[in-house]
Curated annotation (Swiss-Prot):
It is found in: Cell membrane. This is FXYD domain-containing ion transport regulator 6. Regulatory subunit of the sodium/potassium-transporting ATPase which is composed of a catalytic alpha subunit, a non-catalytic beta subunit and an additional regulatory subunit. The regulatory subunit, a member of the FXYD protein family, modulates the enzymatic activity in a tissue- and isoform-specific way by changing affinities of the Na+/K+-ATPase toward Na(+), K(+) or ATP. Gene3D superfamilies: Single helix bin. It holds the Pfam family ATP1G1_PLM_MAT8. Its main location: membrane. Keywords: Cell membrane, Ion transport, Membrane, Potassium, Potassium transport, Signal, Sodium, Sodium transport, Sodium/potassium transport, Transmembrane, Transmembrane helix, Transport. Residues 58-94 are cytoplasmic. GO terms for molecular function: ion channel regulator activity.
Amino acid sequence: METVLVLCSLLAPVVLASAAEKEKEKDPFYYDYQTLRIGGLVFAVVLFSVGILLILSRRCKCSFNQKPRAPGDEEAQVENLITTNAAEPQKAEN
C-alpha cells in the first residue's frame, strides 16, 4: 500500500506539469506587458537622445568665441542650388 502511495505522489507533479502545459497552449498570445513597456521606454529615450545630439552637433560647435557662419556655408550653398535648379526652365522631351 505504501508503494502505491509513493508512486502516486511521484506522478502528481508530472500530472500537474502536463496540466500547466495544456493551459499555456490554450493562450498562444501572451504578452509580458511590463517588459514590453520598459523596452519601449528605453527605445524612446535612446531615439530622443540621438535626435538631440544630432541637432546640437549640427548647430553648436561648443565654442562661445566662434565667429558667426559666413553666408557661403554649406547650408546656404544647398539653398542656392535648390533655387537655381527651380529657376531653370525644364526642357520638353519629344
